[in-house]
Amino acid sequence: MEMNFPTFLILKKINISVCPKFTLKEVIQQTIFSISPNDSNKMMAGELFEVNENQLKVVSLDGHRISIRNVTLKDHYENTKVIVPGKTLSEISKILGGDNEKEVLIYFSANHILFEFDQTIVVSRLIEGEYFRINQMLSSDYETKVTINKKEFLDCIERATILIRENDKKPLILNVGDNTMELKLNSSFGSMNAELMIHKTGKDIMIGFNPKFLIDALRVIDDEEINIYMMNPKSPCFIKDEDATYIY
């Protein structure tokens, strides 16, 4: 089927990147959950797509949490930094197949992004403005590092959330010791207390988290074990792998 597009979209293509279909779908699914659910801040309603030579970085945040995925591309491309609406990415994720052999062509222009795959073309306006300074939010410092089985940790948190109403903000308390981590949650429906085996480097710590935020991140991580980095009870923690291909 012949498709006609506005001339300005064709003329203003200034850059192109190529990414496997499976990789793009995975990257979107692993970041889309932490965009802002409303449009109160337009930057938080989109995701940063940043190409630096052969590296693609995708970032989303909602004011409470941040998701970052770093992907190595096959070739080197012109450096580009744009903000793509989350609604566009959600729709693309739905129609992208899981084929890792086929590729998605991604065209960037000053005001638009164009995705081309499987005889399908998706064009979207970009969100105008400068994205947040992500590097200022990230720190490599930590006082405590916990390595834990991801499935056991996720299963335990999901059991705990049975005791919480949807809008209840009861924190999940993590009490980190030498070889174990205690998980505690109290609500009007009851209480939960569980203990998991861990490998710890650094100090003991007791810290509370929104269990939903942990669940959202853990569900999209494929690793069998995860590393959690913590500074103190009032600072954010980071879940990331050794190569920083993902950071939550």
Predicted regions and their residues:
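Structural preference for solvent-exposed beta-strand-turn elements
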Residues: 1-248
